[in-house]
Amino acid sequence: MITLIAAISTNNALGKDNDLIWRLPADLKRFKKVTSGHHILMGRNTFESIGKPLPNRTSVIITRNNNYKKEGCLIAYSLEEAIAFTEGKDAFIIGGAQVYKQALENNLIDQLDITRVHQEFEADVFFPEIDSTVWKEIYREDFLADEKNVYDYSFISYQKI
């Protein structure tokens, strides 16, 4: 199964200046838990913002640069090639905005795992609208802000209809 995983705000903001806009420790903990042991597929800018391969995951970087190399990572020149690296095993598309858009437009994913941050943010990259004629909410858990997580948020899973 190919799952797209993203944290987005109420106004679908993803990030600004190639970085996350907010810090939400519960989301990072969940991301680590669900992606651990799997392939994670990402664009080059997303990888560069992380800075290194994440532990206990196979990092696949999608780039148009034929000379791009990163130790400890697989390099793909298209999203389809990145998916082929997974050899049919569960994998997660972790960004960025262009990769998300391509995956959604080309019907390459089976599930969406979304952390919805209940706040609007100024951003320069946004997540596409989730089309309710294509995606059905199958799981939702809502949380109020607390001492560690300063925003209300929800973990929501969608399955293709």
Feature locations, PLM:
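Enzymes that bind and transform nitrogen-containing heteroaromatic metabolites
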Residues: 1-161
